[in-house]
C-alpha cells in the first residue's frame, strides 16, 4: 500500500465495464498493459480478444510490460484483430521468447523479452506487502491458481480435499469457484 500510495496514481473508482473506462476522464499519462496471460486467446471463449487488455478505452500512450500469450501460436481467425491492437502500442515487450516471436510475426514489431514482474522483488519485499489475514486457513491447504474456468480441476480438487482433509484456497480473478468450499482470494 505504501508503494502504491507513494509511486502510483491509482483511481479510487472501480470500473466494471469497458464503456465506463472509455467515458471517464482518466488522469493518467499512459496506459500500461501487463503481465501474466492477458493476451492468451484461450481465455476468451467467444474467439475475440478483450479490448480492455489492450488499453483501447483510452487515447493515451500505451505500453505493454511482460504480457504473455500462454500459447505458441495465435489462431488464424484472431491474428488480424491482434495486429490491430498491437499497432496501438508505442512500446511492447513479452514475458517469453514465443510471445516476442508472436508480436514480431503478427505486428512486425520488436518486443524484448523481459522478466516477469513478480520476479523483480525479493521474497522479503513480497512478504512486507503480503496480506496475512487471520481468516486464512491455519496449517496446510491446497492452493489452486486458475487462469480460466476451473472445469477439469474440480473433481481432482475434490479428490485431493477428501484424501488430505486440507481446505482449498482459490487464488485467481475468476468468479467461478473450483471447489464448493474453496476460499476465494480475488486480489492476488
Regions picked out by a protein language model, each given a short descriptive name:
Residues 30-34, 64-66, 93, 143-145, ...:
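Structural motif
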Residues 129-171:
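Conserved catalytic-core segment of nucleotide-activated headgroup transferases in glycan assembly
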Residues 89-96:
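A short beta-strand/loop micro-motif in the catalytic core of glycosyltransferases
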Residues 38, 98-99:
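Alpha-helix capping/helix-boundary segments
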Residues 61-70, 102-103, 153-188:
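Catalytic donor nucleotide-activated moiety binding site of glycosyltransferases and closely related
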Residues 1-84:
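Aromatic- and Gly/Pro-rich donor/ligand-binding loops
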Residues 71-77, 119-133:
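Acidic anion/phosphate-binding donor-loop and adjacent secondary structure
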Residues 100-118:
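Helix-loop-beta element that forms the nucleotide-linked donor phosphate-binding surface
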